[in-house]
Amino acid sequence: MNSITLLQPDDWHAHLRDGLALKRTVPDLAKQFARAICMPNLVPPVKTVEEALAYRERILAHVPEGNNFDPRMVLYFTDHTSPDEVRKIKESEHVNAIKLYPAGATTNSDNGVSDIRKVYAVIEQLEEHQVPLLLHGEVTHNHVDIFDREKRFLDEVLSPLLKQFPKLKVVLEHITTSDAAHFVLEQDRNVAATITPQHLLFNRNDMLVGGIKPHFYCLPILKRQTHQTTLLEVATSGNPKFFLGTDSAPHAQNAKENACGCAGCYSAPNAIELYAQAFDQVGKLERLEGFASHFGADFYGLPRNTSTITLVKEDNLVPESFDYLDNQKIIPLHAGKTLQWRKV
């Protein structure tokens, strides 16, 4: 197969940041996707529908002319989120979900939920109104090994949560383990998962063997190859529980390449080509459209896109860097390497 045409894909998990960063991040994402779930972990975080709509306007100001990119907004779940905010989400045209970060789990997550039992009143409303709860699925206790944090979250947090709220709509974001894949498969249709390009294409050897490569460092961290293999199997299976979410996370080069570098891979500029490469490597390119363009929209209850994109099989050199912020650079995922697919 030398070319493939798909309904325009959506990104159900992306970080755009705010302020000057939007000049870089919004056009990069808008060239690839029709819609994106825009993460709320700003400083300060996006905690109300009003704040989300104001952030959406700041994003729209950077969408290139002639592009119909539609930012879909999310609220940041805190210990102090009001149950009434769920009703406002349900009534909003542009806000689609609420995101739970365990406090301290990832970038700008200090305001996250400290104990999920504290917010059961809000979760009751989420279940009643069928508003999706998006989960960063890791525990954050210092004594838990970083490679075990996703599995422990499933056992200690998510399993009890779904017993208490069996109809809750849940997206387990950026899954990285066989444990998470099998957990999602075992649940009813109300539980789904997103998968990033880096967790399909790479594993922890790519990050750690032959020198530490900070641009592969993200959270949840890359796992061993056996987990990567399982993620590829479920992503390419045609199962509608699994769909595209890049978790594209911009950090300036100097914030990644230092003694305590930030977590996040910037995949937005070549995201759909990265996914195409992963699907093609296992001979499942015909399954890409469902994963990228159908299943996420279906889960969120939104119409599928009607426009299309075409990918052709030809060498596509990923740039070494892009301009970012004031006189800084950002290094994209797979910088300087050649992909086999190009969006035309």
Curated annotation (Swiss-Prot):
Organism whose genome encodes this protein: Acinetobacter baumannii (strain ACICU)
Enzymatic reactions: (S)-dihydroorotate + H2O = N-carbamoyl-L-aspartate + H(+)
EC assignment: 3.5.2.3
Needed cofactors: Zn(2+)
Subunit structure: Homodimer.
Gene3D superfamilies, A to Z: Metal-dependent hydrolases
UniProt KW keywords: Hydrolase, Metal-binding, Pyrimidine biosynthesis, Zinc
Designated name of the protein: Dihydroorotase
Gene designation: pyrC
Disulfide bonds listed in the record: none
Family classification: Belongs to the metallo-dependent hydrolases superfamily. DHOase family. Class II DHOase subfamily.
GO cellular component: cytosol
Record-listed Zn(2+) 2 binding positions: K99, H136, H174
Enzyme class: hydrolase
Classification via HAMAP family: PyrC_classII
Active site: D247
Any GO BP: 'de novo' UMP biosynthetic process
CDD domains attached to this UniProt entry: DHOase
GO molecular function: dihydroorotase activity; zinc ion binding
Residues annotated with N6-carboxylysine modification: K99
Amino-acid positions noted as binding substrate in the UniProt annotation, renumbered to this chain: H15, L16, R17, N41, H136, L219, H251, A263
Binding site for Zn(2+) 1: H13, H15, K99, D247
Pathway in which the depicted protein is active: Pyrimidine metabolism; UMP biosynthesis via de novo pathway; (S)-dihydroorotate from bicarbonate: step 3/3
Database matches in InterPro entries: Amidohydro-rel, DHOdimr, Dihydroorotase_CS, Metal_Hydrolase
Highest taxon, organism lineage: Bacteria
Free-text comment on the cofactor: Binds 2 Zn(2+) ions per subunit.
